């Protein structure tokens, strides 16, 4: 596993996590 794929995986995790936080914030948790 190279650093590029590791960086992309980390980026996707952060993106999905922030997106779920935005959805939860709009729904009032």
Curated annotation (Swiss-Prot):
One of its GO terms (cellular component) is chloroplast thylakoid membrane. It is a single-pass membrane protein. It is found in: Plastid, Chloroplast thylakoid membrane. The chain crosses the membrane at residues 3-23. GO terms for molecular function: electron transporter, transferring electrons within cytochrome b6/f complex of photosystem II activity. Keywords: Chloroplast, Electron transport, Membrane, Photosynthesis, Plastid, Thylakoid, Transmembrane, Transmembrane helix, Transport. GO terms for biological process: cytochrome complex assembly; photosynthesis. Component of the cytochrome b6-f complex, which mediates electron transfer between photosystem II (PSII) and photosystem I (PSI), cyclic electron flow around PSI, and state transitions. The 4 large subunits of the cytochrome b6-f complex are cytochrome b6, subunit IV (17 kDa polypeptide, PetD), cytochrome f and the Rieske protein, while the 4 small subunits are PetG, PetL, PetM and PetN. The complex functions as a dimer. Belongs to the PetN family. This is Cytochrome b6-f complex subunit 8.
